[in-house]
């Protein structure tokens, strides 16, 4: 009886083993069939893709051949005038004194957009260029003005819906606690969509000494938007050149998304005098002949002192001169020796005593920030 049971167990064990072997063999064959089918399907997919590529290439050749060599899409001048690009570039020339390299770079970008539009009119291929930019330079060198004009150009050429400018800093983008940064960053992006987002002093978004800094979350959101929405949003990163270079070294993904780097040089004293004259003209004032050398000497000295900010410093000086002119005229008109009358010329002229002199500037020292 024992022998019978032993033989029966052995029989069942062998049978189970054989069944397992059979199942493994069948599974192996099935896996091989699946793998072979995948290889066949992949080969077929590649073959179909190659055929589609060939057909697309042939269609492109046929399309190009169908366009006469002497076909005209219009003149560059016509498009510059019709779309208002020429007017914007002329306004940029009038708004900004000097900055020849900056204006040349803006013209290059405008030229690319105009030529792309000419190509599109003929049915030629066009690809949306990377229009994200980096503006480097000291404060008051015209970065915000250029960003505003670029938005207008992009809108006129059909690359942005509205072309408006939104200026933001770290405080506008980065939150103070967990879960606060993403909504803030997305809200700013939402406001800028269809136009230009200028992030001033962008390097403050990244804190190398704190890997838990909330700025990293804002950067990741910006990177995604710059890639996915580049047809409807242009991001301009601005700041000092050395700090921006360091920022890009920490965030290589940001550097690869920025296709246009424009450096804004500091103004010379002569250019700052011209800027002051333009500001006065726009405000319907003018400097007297005696006032010009006073301001020129002032600005030369001011350039060597702390907190100098190029055109911003000039604007502060002009605003200060207007206040001093106002109190001068007020005192003259209310003095006992005056009939109280003030002429148009007096109301429009800034005299030398209205501007801060070099002597006053030196006496103030570091308090010159007050202008």
From Swiss-Prot:
The intrachain disulfides are none
Organelle transit peptide residues: 1-54
Give the keywords, sorted.
ATP-binding, Chloroplast, Nucleotide-binding, Plastid, Transit peptide
Q: Name one Pfam family in it.
A: AAA
Q: Which GO terms describe its cellular component?
A: chloroplast
Please name the InterPro entries in this protein's record.
Answer: AAA+_ATPase, AAA_lid_6, ATPase_AAA_core, CbxX/CfqX_mono, CbxX/CfxQ, CbxX/CfxQ_RuBisCO_ESX, P-loop_NTPase
Asked if Iron-sulfur is a keyword of the record, the answer is no
Q: Where in the cell is it found?
A: Plastid, Chloroplast
Q: Which SMART domains does the record match to this protein?
A: AAA
Residues annotated for ATP binding in this entry:
137-144
Output the CDD domains linked to this UniProt entry.
AAA
The GO molecular function terms of this record are:
ATP binding; ATP hydrolysis activity
Concerning its family, UniProt says: Belongs to the CbxX/CfxQ family.
The record's section on PANTHER family has: AAA-TYPE ATPASE FAMILY PROTEIN / ANKYRIN REPEAT FAMILY PROTEIN, AAA-TYPE ATPASE FAMILY PROTEIN _ ANKYRIN REPEAT FAMILY PROTEIN
Free-text function comment from the UniProt entry: Seems to be necessary for the expression of RuBisCO.
**Name listed for the protein in its UniProt record:** Protein cbbX homolog, chloroplastic
Organism (species): Guillardia theta
The encoding gene: cbbX
